[in-house]
Design a protein with these regions (language model features):
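Transmembrane alpha-helix boundary signature
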Residues: 33-44, 61-64, 78-93, 112-131
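C-terminal ends of transmembrane helices
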Residues: 6-10, 78-93, 142-153, 196-207, ...
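Structural signature of hydrophobic alpha-helical transmembrane segments
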Residues: 64-76, 124-139, 180-193, 229-237, ...
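Entry/N-cap segments of selected transmembrane alpha helices
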Residues: 87-113, 184-193, 281-307, 330-334, ...
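Hydrophobic core segments of alpha-helical transmembrane domains in multi-pass membrane transport
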Residues: 23-34, 75-81, 111-113, 194-200, ...
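Hydrophobic transmembrane alpha-helices of secondary-active transporters
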Residues: 56, 60-61, 65-89, 239-241, ...
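Functional cores that coordinate and move charged inorganic groups
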Residues: 145, 149-242
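Predominantly late transmembrane helices and immediately cytosolic-facing juxtamembrane segments
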Residues: 1-15, 204, 208-218, 222, ...
């Protein structure tokens, strides 16, 4: 059964795995540059302002904000296409198949958040970062898994992919409900009107992307102005892309997913990693990691993630609610649970939102995310390597 299930998945896995390695290279380059004589150029370039628009209709944002607000909206558009496809015909379309990654993902979001809250309890400012260690970087985690090749059952790769996709859905909901600014009812109304037009296009059977793109571009602008984070526009747009097919033709959703995936994997996410992973390590010591923000993130990712995913998955299997992935052991599953602690790009993104008004914590976020993700990478890899030899 796994062989049949994995056919549409293998292309996606290879793409995400390769993307993870590119992300790693981008992050390393950012760290090297931000700690070299080019550091001033690096940070100043990210803070340069660019105006995009016509006359008074447009936005003037820093390079850093264009990356985090526009490029990440495209990323979330792509992620939502994946989620929609998975719920319609993929690993999440059958409740019995979906329960294990769903339950594991819930544990992987709740426990890290709890760990962070315990460490930062009593500080209202730093508590705002509670969601940072709840995210999983799907590309990076699958990239590490790919290094083990056939030694890891395909069922575990599917489990990790499904769990990370559900994690992304959780991140989308967290951004929408917890990290939005002061809301403008007038712009929210325009967002709603735009969305209604998109739904009408869907219901009318429009299968060309251009009409969706034009309305979606306006909706992104209205969303940014409304106070809701602009990435939510990508989510709303993707939710209206039709997935119905006639004959042997692919749906618009499938066509778009395949068309933009290389750009997301090898351009958008590496650019995001390069722009957000740079942090000065000058004066960094063990005491830096023991500050509440980086420590909460580090332990949330490295301890909270593996404990949450593993315990929730264990209970789900033992109570008969869900089934173990085919041809896998508990040690296999534990290794994958550890890899979910690779938060990297998603954790950095949530961190930027959480401390948008308190930027003094951003360096601590980067240190905690990088340290927690690195520990999860090394420990998870060696656990899986050891389990494959038994």
């Amino acid at each position: 059964m796994i062989n049949n299930l994995s056919k549409p998945f293998k292309w996606f896995f290879k793409l995400e795995a390769a993307s993870g390695l590119v992300l790693l290279i981008s992050a390393i380059i950012a760290l090297i540059i931000s700690n070299s004589y080019l550091s001033e150029l690096y940070f100043n370039t990210l803070e340069q302002y660019l105006f995009i628009g016509i006359n008074d209709f447009g936005l003037k944002l820093s390079v850093h904000h264009w990356i985090n607000d526009l490029l990440m909206a495209i990323f979330f558009f792509f992620v939502t296409l994946e989620i929609k496809r998975e719920f319609i015909q993929g690993e999440l379309s059958n409740l019995k198949k979906a329960l294990l990654p769903i339950i594991g993902a819930v544990g992987g979001m709740l426990v890290p958040a709890l760990v962070y809250i315990v460490i930062n309890f009593g500080d209202i400012e730093t508590l705002n970062g509670w969601a940072i260690p709840s995210a999983t970087d799907i590309a990076f985690s699958l990239g590490i898994l790919s290094l083990l090749g056939s030694r890891v059952p395909i069922s575990l790769k599917i489990f990790l992919t499904a769990l990370a996709i559900i994690d992304d859905l959780g991140a989308i909901l967290i951004i929408a409900f917890f990290y939005s600014g002061d809301l403008s009812l007038s712009y929210l109304s325009l967002v709603l009107i735009s969305y209604i037009f998109l739904v009408i296009l869907n219901k009318s059977g429009v299968k060309k992307f251009i009409p969706y793109l034009i309305i979606g571009a306006f909706m992104w602008f209205f969303t940014y102005k409304s106070g809701i984070h602009a990435t939510i526009a990508g989510v709303l747009l993707a939710s209206t892309i039709p997935h119905k097919v006639k004959g042997k033709d692919f749906s618009l959703l499938i066509k778009l997913e395949h068309a933009i995936s290389p750009y997301v994997a090898f351009m958008i996410m590496p650019i995001f990693a390069f722009a957000n992973a740079g942090v000065s390590l000058e004066g960094l010591s063990l005491l830096s990691l023991l500050q509440p923000v980086p420590l909460g993130i580090l332990l949330g990712l490295f301890v909270g993630k593996q404990v949450g995913v593993m315990i929730f998955s264990f209970v789900a299997v033992k109570t008969g609610m869900a089934q173990m992935p085919d041809n896998s052991s508990w040690l296999n599953l534990y290794g994958v649970s550890v890899l979910t602690g690779i938060g990297f790009t998603m954790s950095l993104f949530v961190g930027n939102l959480a401390f948008a008004e308190n930027i003094q914590y951003i360096d601590g976020v980067k240190i905690g995310v990088l340290a927690g993700s690195l520990l999860s990478t090394l420990f998870g890899y060696f656990i899986l390597l050891f389990s494959s030899k038994k």
